[in-house]
Structures are given as C-alpha cells and as structure tokens.
C-alpha cells in the first residue's frame, strides 16, 4: 500500500494511510488474527455477521420505501 508524501507533510500522509487501511479492513483483519479462532467459531461469527448485514439492508430498504420511519437524530 502506497501513500504519497507531499511537501514533507508526514502527518497528512499518515492520516491518508490510516484511512486507506481502514477502508481495506486491515485493522479489523489484524485484530481478528491476534488470537487463533476455531473453525466452528469462525463459521458462527461469519453467519452472525451475514444475518446482521441482511437485517441492516432490509431496514434501510424499508425506510427508503416508507414502511418504517427513519431514526431521529440524537441531540
């Protein structure tokens, strides 16, 4: 992964690198590989993530179609 450093601005380059790594899911992957995960636990986690993803998409679709009200903004 490469990030250009312009005008010796290392802070900006680091922010860009972190953003790229976040988007690619590298931080999450590193956290997951910290400890061994049994194959059965991995399957269960992936299934739970898939269920969560499907529910979220269904909720967004229902909000878009006007079946349920959109969540109010927090104060």
Curated annotation (Swiss-Prot):
<comment type="similarity">
    <text>Belongs to the bacterial ribosomal protein bS21 family.</text>
</comment>
<dbReference type="InterPro" id="IPR038380">
    <property type="entry name" value="Ribosomal_bS21_sf"/>
</dbReference>
<dbReference type="InterPro" id="IPR018278">
    <property type="entry name" value="Ribosomal_bS21_CS"/>
</dbReference>
<dbReference type="GO" id="GO:1990904">
    <property type="term" value="C:ribonucleoprotein complex"/>
</dbReference>
<dbReference type="GO" id="GO:0005840">
    <property type="term" value="C:ribosome"/>
</dbReference>
<keyword id="KW-0687">Ribonucleoprotein</keyword>
<dbReference type="InterPro" id="IPR001911">
    <property type="entry name" value="Ribosomal_bS21"/>
</dbReference>
<dbReference type="GO" id="GO:0006412">
    <property type="term" value="P:translation"/>
</dbReference>
<keyword id="KW-0689">Ribosomal protein</keyword>
<protein>
    <recommendedName>
        <fullName>Small ribosomal subunit protein bS21A</fullName>
    </recommendedName>
</protein>
<dbReference type="Pfam" id="PF01165">
    <property type="entry name" value="Ribosomal_S21"/>
</dbReference>
<dbReference type="GO" id="GO:0003735">
    <property type="term" value="F:structural constituent of ribosome"/>
</dbReference>
């Amino acid at each position: 992964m490469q990030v250009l450093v312009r005008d010796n601005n290392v802070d900006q380059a680091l922010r860009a690198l972190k953003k790229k790594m976040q988007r690619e899911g590298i931080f999450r992957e590193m956290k997951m590989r910290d400890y061994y995960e049994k194959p059965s636990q991995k399957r269960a986690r992936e299934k739970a993530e898939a269920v969560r993803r499907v529910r979220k998409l269904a909720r967004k679709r229902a909000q878009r179609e006007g079946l349920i009200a959109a969540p109010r903004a927090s104060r």
